[in-house]
Amino acid sequence: MGLLDITDLIVFYENAIAINNINMSFNKGRIIGIFGANSAGKSTLMYTISGIILDVKKKEEMKGGERITIMGNILYDGQDITSLEPSERARRGIVLCPERRRIFIESSVMENLRIGGILATKRQAKETLDYIFSLFPTLIKLRNRPGGFLSGGEQQMLAIGRALMAQPEVLLLDEPLLGLSPAMEDVVTDAIEDINKDRGITIVLSLIHI
């Protein structure tokens, strides 16, 4: 049994199957890559592990939209979290950095980071903030700039930093290299390796290419 175990997971939208009977086990402290083409179900898997798929399902049901069916089980550290809300999963240490980054474009870099650390203690927030700035020194000079005025690469650094402020034990990175220049891909890739090595965080990332 790993830190995170997925058993017989099936997710389908109306008649389209997004995830078909997946069984996976992620060991603690590892970097796990999930590779696939567009529309292969990578984002759906990330949303399902983080629990955000449950919010999407509720919204679709409320507006009479697309029906989403989820079957199977997800165990985290031996506990069944299949029905837990995403906020509770985040409190337990499962944090998603989504493909579209979803930073607050009118808020500054510092404000975005503080929002990410809302559940952290003051000591945790300060230590993590110092670590983020050592990981991404560029964010220091950009700390007062609104998120909407950052480049794609700068937004990705901020999104990863904000996720770290939430004190994850499992960090889900959905397409962290999407739309980045080769140079910025190297920066982000190096940062992912450093985060895993320095903080022992289990990292699951989805990628279209290697």
Outline where the language-model segments fall.
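ABC-type ATPase nucleotide-binding domains, specifically the catalytic core motifs of the NBD
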Residues: 14, 53-61, 107-127, 135-137
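The feature captures the beta-strand-to-loop junction immediately N-terminal to the Walker
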Residues: 35-37
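ABC ATPase NBD Q-loop/coupling interface
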Residues: 59-88
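Conserved small/polar residues in nucleotide/adenosyl-binding loops
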Residues: 208-210
